[in-house]
């Protein structure tokens, strides 16, 4: 799933990488949401769980690659810093006094206020990102 699209991305330093990666990441987020919903049902099959695991792995890998590039977004940098620190969105949010849904929104490339952006940047720095 999405393997061909990921493999077709230009190198991370290419000017087209951020925009093209954003499209793939958006699709992976949607697919992950659908698979997570299916996995939470009582009749989930092993194939659904395996697919969900695969999508999450590819998403983490692509977010990590994107976060290390020159066009990294705040959401990508936050996601990877949080992932490396092994923090949930709720734990990260509590650490800087914001709502969990703000962390999730920023990681999904939704805008934040200037004050929220400053808090998130401080969190990323504190986590070594």
Curated annotation (Swiss-Prot):
Binds 2-aminothiazole antibiotics, which are antitubercular agents. The lineage of its organism: Bacteria, Bacillati, Actinomycetota, Actinomycetes, Mycobacteriales. Keywords: Isopeptide bond, Ubl conjugation. This is Uncharacterized protein MSMEG_6518/MSMEI_6344. There is a cross-link at residue 121 (Isoglutamyl lysine isopeptide (Lys-Gln) (interchain with Q-Cter in protein Pup)). It comes from Mycolicibacterium smegmatis (strain ATCC 700084 / mc(2)155) (Mycobacterium smegmatis).
């Amino acid at each position: 799933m999405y393997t061909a699209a990921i493999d077709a991305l230009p190198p991370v330093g290419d000017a087209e990488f951020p925009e093209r990666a954003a499209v793939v990441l958006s699709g992976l987020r949607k697919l992950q949401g659908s698979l997570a919903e299916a996995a939470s049902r009582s009749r989930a099959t092993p194939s659904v769980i395996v697919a969900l695991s695969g999508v999450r792995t590819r998403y983490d890998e692509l977010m990590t690659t994107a976060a290390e590039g020159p066009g990294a977004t705040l959401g990508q940098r936050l996601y990877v810093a949080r992932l490396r620190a092994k923090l949930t969105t709720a734990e990260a949010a509590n650490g800087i006094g914001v709502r969990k849904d703000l962390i999730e929104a920023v990681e999904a490339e939704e805008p934040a206020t200037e004050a929220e952006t400053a808090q998130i940047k401080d969190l990323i720095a504190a986590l070594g990102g």
